[in-house]
From Swiss-Prot:
Region annotation (Disordered) ranges: 527-670
Listed Pfam families: ATP-synt_ab, ATP-synt_ab_C, ATP-synt_ab_N
The organism's place on the tree of life at top rank: Bacteria
Membership in a protein family: Belongs to the ATPase alpha/beta chains family.
Full protein name: ATP synthase subunit alpha 2
Classification via NCBIfam families: atpA (TIGR00962), PRK13343.1 (NF009884)
Quaternary assembly: F-type ATPases have 2 components, CF(1) - the catalytic core - and CF(0) - the membrane proton channel. CF(1) has five subunits: alpha(3), beta(3), gamma(1), delta(1), epsilon(1). CF(0) has three main subunits: a(1), b(2) and c(9-12). The alpha and beta chains form an alternating ring which encloses part of the gamma chain. CF(1) is attached to CF(0) by a central stalk formed by the gamma and epsilon chains, while a peripheral stalk is formed by the delta and b chains.
Species in which this protein is naturally found: Burkholderia pseudomallei (strain 668)
Catalytic activity: ATP + H2O + 4 H(+)(in) = ADP + phosphate + 5 H(+)(out)
Keyword Ion transport assigned: yes
Basic and acidic residues composition bias: residue spans: 543-588, 621-639
Family annotation (InterPro entries): ATP_synth_asu-like_sf, ATP_synth_asu_C, ATP_synth_asu_C_sf, ATP_synth_F1_a_nt-bd_dom, ATP_synth_F1_asu, ATPase_a/bsu_AS, ATPase_F1/V1/A1_a/bsu_N, ATPase_F1/V1/A1_a/bsu_N_sf
EC top class, as a word: translocase
Length: 670
């Protein structure tokens, strides 16, 4: 039995009276009252800081909007005034300008739509692209994960740089400081780490603070050319922008990276650099009349950087297992690691990679100081095969550097020490790596195993660079030959026997590289031209010349075998007497020539050139005088070089006479 609808309700629905009544009841329940909005006034403005009064309830870091559309955030809160850091040019902000609260804190857009884009710290595009869809926003100031929310750092973050991956391993979720003097390759090392993530699942965020626009453009172009820009976000606050944007830039970069970390992905943040960020914080603090401390920095500078870098972490499996790694960059002055900001950052981070200006000047790139650099995670996040292969690398290299310092005072006679010096030179050549020449983990393990086995000891250090360039293709070919058809993928790093076999094959590659180098040295041309220019007419002439020289040497060896030792000694005595007489005659001729009485030589007619007209005759006369001033070949010297043998009349090649002739010519020139 179906229920019948209520007649009044049906009538109301038909006429719409019920809907109207309900709407009237809802409107009656709304409390209509005026809403008070506090409006403050600008008391004064200077250097990107506005001092505002009348907004006592403002929160710290709250966004304030000025009349005319300029925005800023509350930096310090005093009883009477609020120091507001402007995020836009202060044009239009004057005294008595109205200021209103927004009730919101600074936020930045986050999400996949930022990948491949260049934005400012507020998410505004700088690459000329379309505006970003702010479907997801995150506050720039977020709390760091608690201890219970973190997990151990146990996965490596491969940088492709051998010295970093082997000696100072960086783990996913680690904070590793890159520190060094100006122009020592700090940014280059960080960009190499970003470029190497093109084959990984890591999202990279590059934050530029106070950098020149041209330098930032070079970084972006390098990532677009060698890396995977579709997996990178560039947050740029150049030196020409407002100090407020430079101050919030690293916080915005971390918030963008945290979006991916919180979803179980892995992210890497490069902050370039925190020294300029500290200078910006000091500038804002001094402008807002905060009391200065050591090196004029405010007392909270340590807390500012600590709360920023503590946001890098490896989350637990319950939270998705994502990670956020940080590579902050800091600049030192004349290598002073004991300065205020460097010591703060070293104590906050999980290790540091120190770049030395002397090593950089010696053309060692990257110029990593092995003695001062450290990773406090290290082997816990290193691949087991790489950890086993690089066990003694740091110790051997440190001992080599110490021995090398002693060799400057004298030679080494101990064979063991000489072998250690040789091994150290190969290690230094191996860890010297050009930019954008990243190595795979397999390449690094095989190289270190070959080094430990002594395969590199016999090769020249100059051949290490060709070995590093040709090794990946060589290993790929070897793996393809060792892998059966339709075989499942194989983890070569987990097979010690396979790694040993690949390391042994490096010896064959070294022999090929050495043979190619010898061939190029013999041909006297670069590698790219040697293959194409040896053949043909030039190659035939060179081959014929080599054959003639070989025939001459063979004939001389045959003559030497035909002459008896007694005949050779007799010829040597005859040649010595002849050379002695020749030397006496040359000395007498030199003395006569100096005195103007050279025998057998007519004095040149010096009046003849004056009678000659200008042109070829004068040039010919000058050429004659020049040829006369050059030493002429001596017939007797030539005869002395080939002396008859008393047994058989064979000719003997005598080198001693040639040496005496050379000494006589040298005396003549003096």
């Amino acid at each position: 039995m179906t229920p019948t609808p209520d007649a009044p309700a049906a009538a109301d629905a038909a006429t719409g009276a019920g809907w109207l009544a309900r709407r009237r009841g809802a409107l009656a329940r709304v409390a209509l009252a005026p809403v008070a909005q506090a409006i403050g006034r600008v008391e004064r403005v200077a250097d990107g800081i506005a001092f505002v009064s009348g907004l006592e309830d403002t929160m710290l870091n709250e966004v304030l909007r000025f009349e005319g559309g300029v925005t800023g955030f509350a930096h310090t809160l005093d009883e009477d005034l609020i120091s507001v850091v402007l995020l836009d040019p202060d044009a239009g902000v004057r005294a008595q300008t109205a200021v209103a609260r927004t009730g919101a804190v600074l936020e930045v857009p986050a999400g996949p739509q930022l990948l491949g884009r260049v934005v400012d710290p507020l998410g505004r595009p700088l690459d000329g692209g379309a505006p970003l869809d702010a479907a997801h926003t995150l506050p720039i100031e977020r709390a760091a994960p608690a201890i219970i929310e973190r997990d151990l750092v146990s996965e490596p973050l491969d940088t492709g740089v051998l010295i970093v991956d082997a000696l100072f391993t960086i783990g996913r979720g680690q904070r590793e400081l890159i520190i060094g003097d100006r122009a020592t390759g700090k940014t280059s090392l960080a960009i190499d780490a970003i470029v190497n993530q093109r084959h990984s699942d890591v999202i990279c965020v590059y934050v530029a603070i106070g950098q020149r626009a041209s330098a930032v453009r070079r970084v972006i172009d390098a990532v677009r050319r060698y890396g995977a820009p579709e997996r990178c976000v560039f947050v740029v606050a150049p030196a020409a922008c407002a100090p407020g944007l430079q101050w919030i830039a690293p916080f915005a970069g971390f918030s963008i990276a945290e979006y991916f970390r919180d979803r179980g992905q892995h992210a890497l943040v490069v902050v370039d650099d925190l020294t300029k960020h500290a200078a910006t914080h000091r500038e804002l603090a001094l402008l807002t009349r905060e009391p200065p401390g050591r090196e004029a920095y405010p007392g909270d500078i340590f807390y500012v950087h600590a709360r920023l870098l503590e946001r890098a972490a490896k989350l637990s499996a319950a939270l998705g297992g994502g990670s956020l790694s940080a590579l902050p960059i800091a600049e030192t002055d004349a290598g002073n690691l004991a300065a205020y900001i460097p010591t703060n950052l070293i104590s906050i981070t999980d290790g540091q990679i120190v770049l030395d200006s002397a090593l950089f000047a010696a053309n060692q790139r990257p110029a990593v100081d092995v003695g001062l650099s450290v990773s406090r995670v290290g082997g816990k996040a290193q691949h087991p095969a790489l950890r086993a292969a690089s066990g003694r690398l740091r110790l051997d290299y440190a001992q080599f550097l110490e021995l090398e310092a002693f060799t400057r005072f004298g030679g080494l006679t101990d064979a063991r020490l000489r072998a250690q010096i040789t091994r150290g030179e190969r290690i230094r050549a191996l860890i010297t790596q050009p930019r954008f020449r990243a190595l795979r983990t397999l390449d690094e393990v095989v190289l270190l195993k070959a080094l430990a086995a002594g395969a590199l000891d016999a090769m020249s250090p100059d051949l290490v660079a060709p070995l590093r360039e040709r090794l990946p293709a060589w290993l790929d070919a070897r793996i393809a030959a060792l892998t059966p058809a339709l075989a499942p993928p194989r983890d070569w790093l987990a097979d010690d026997a396979a790694l040993d076999a690949l390391a042994e094959s490096v010896g064959e590659l070294i022999e090929r590289i050495a043979a190619d180098a010898a061939h190029r040295a013999t041909a006297g041309m670069p590698a790219e031209d040697a293959a194409g220019d040896i053949g043909g007419a030039f190659g035939g002439e060179q081959a014929r010349g080599d054959a003639d020289r070989d025939a001459d040497h063979g004939a001389n060896r045959e003559v030497s075998r035909e002459v008896s030792p007694e005949a050779s000694r007799e010829v040597s005595r005859e040649v010595s007497r002849e050379v002695s007489h020749e030397a006496d005659r040359d000395a007498a001729a030199d003395a006569a020539r100096v005195a103007g009485r050279a025998p057998g030589r007519a004095e040149p007619d010096r009046a003849a050139p004056r009678a000659m007209p200008d042109g070829p005759p004068r040039a010919q006369a000058d050429g004659d005088r020049a040829s006369a001033s050059r030493p002429r070949p001596d017939a007797r010297g030539d005869a002395a070089r080939t002396a008859p043998s008393p047994q058989g009349g064979a000719e003997v090649n005598v080198n001693a006479a040639a040496n005496v002739d050379a000494e006589a010519e040298a005396r003549h020139k003096r």
